[in-house]
Amino acid sequence: MNTRPFKVLGIQQIAIGGADKLRLQKLWVDLFGLEVTGTFRSERENVDEDICALGQGPLKVEVDLMQPLDPEKKPAVHATPLNHIGLWIDDLPVAVQWLTDQGVRFAPGGIRRGGAGFDICFVHPKGSDEFPVGGEGVLIELVQAPPEVVQAFTALANGVR
């Protein structure tokens, strides 16, 4: 296997879909105590989501509670309750190029700005003839880590607290 020219630093987010966001809020916000830190709404992505935080500082994990704007349209963010996971990447453009060269299939849209303000792209849940490597049923979001996240994970890896 080739030497990987980038690092997966940690989990950036978990996205949970449901037909009714209020039911998700009951558990995640009201009972588990996650804080709603923002919202994101996109006709193109057929999503209305609350962006919540689990933990603090640069190592916090984003938990997105999502419902479709129109349950009859795609993408159907509620059809798979665990919609996707997001991974912090230290150098997203390098990662995308290298993974593409290794046969990884990406979802349409390329690198773009995500709902939380970071550059993102998605590994497709299924491989294809041209790009045989996919997420084996899981949509995986690759997220460009900001400098403070890269520094925090580097310090953690080096045993610095």
Regions found by a protein language model. Give the residues of each.
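N-terminal beta-strand motif that seeds the catalytic metal site of vicinal oxygen chelate
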Residues: 1-25, 82-89, 143-161
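A short, N-terminal "cap"/entry segment at the start of jelly-roll beta-barrel domains
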Residues: 2, 29-30, 41
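Conserved short beta-strand elements that form part of the metal-binding/catalytic scaffold
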Residues: 35-76, 116-146
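Residue-level detector of anion-binding/catalytic polar loops
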Residues: 35, 88, 105
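Amphipathic alpha-helical segments
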Residues: 20-35, 95-102
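Alpha-helix termination/capping residues and helix-transition junctions
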Residues: 8, 31-33, 79, 136
